[in-house]
């Protein structure tokens, strides 16, 4: 029988903690596939903080860390400076990277820290009930914007 699919080596052989239909599992799997194709898995320091993105360290076989809520860029900065040969990858949600943790994200970028930040932007605080976040589009109805959001969103990638 021809093998048409196999688990990428950097993904742990564990059940996913993510909800059915959620994109986190696919995003993390895609990241692991790219890291494996680049042959840098041994150099990876995979990090995150609160929220669903923090579960990503349980399904990968990378050296990993979780930080206090919204402080992943600050913790990662210290890790990178102490281990300059490491490849530091942060997996954060929009609430973590662009709302509550925007200051840490912005200042790490402004300092030119050698970090890779992957932001899973679902435009809401998904884990706590679907409240509007800083990236929620104008007009979007959430549990806290029943008439539609009136606040222009932050475009983190810009």
Feature locations, PLM:
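Glycine-rich, charge-decorated loop segments at or immediately adjacent to ligand/cofactor-binding or catalytic sites
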Residues: 126-132
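Active-site diphosphate/adenylate-binding microenvironment
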Residues: 2-68
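Thiamine diphosphate
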Residues: 52-126
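Generic secondary-structure signature for well-ordered alpha-helical cores
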Residues: 24-27, 33-40, 81-84, 110-113, ...
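Conserved thiamine diphosphate
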Residues: 6, 133-158
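Short Gly/charged-rich anion-binding patches and loops
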Residues: 30, 103, 155
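Flexible, glycine/proline-enriched loop segments at strand-loop-helix junctions
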Residues: 17-21, 91-95, 140-149
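Catalytic-loop motifs flanking and including active-site residues across diverse enzymes
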Residues: 23, 27, 71-75, 152, ...
